[in-house]
């Protein structure tokens, strides 16, 4: 009988740890959907405007792709442009979680680019594309530098 009770306690403990890890992960509150703009998958917060947010991220991603391509053609010998081209991955663009203290960030030089798409933390009003593109250009600059 002691083994059964011990086994149940271990099972419950492990289950709680697994749930806590999943709950605190980036993917807990994100739903990945395909944008109609470019056909790529974007992971966005679960809410009513899933398609609008995915399309906004797709438009900004297209703007980033155009900029990176333009820089690649215009300044092919510059090391910072080469780093930007190497580090930029348009398939790794996400929306930030509501728990994030950042409006935008890049992880590990391009493994992930995350953007807040609303005007306020709790708001439902989407930020305009030009403002988000401005923020995205700032994040791209982090990919082009050697340090943070």
Positions of predicted regions on the chain:
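Active-site-proximal or metal-binding-adjacent scaffold patches in catalytic folds
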Residues: 1-133, 143-148
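A conserved beta-strand element that flanks and buttresses the S-adenosyl-L-methionine
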Residues: 136
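Walker B catalytic acidic pair
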Residues: 139
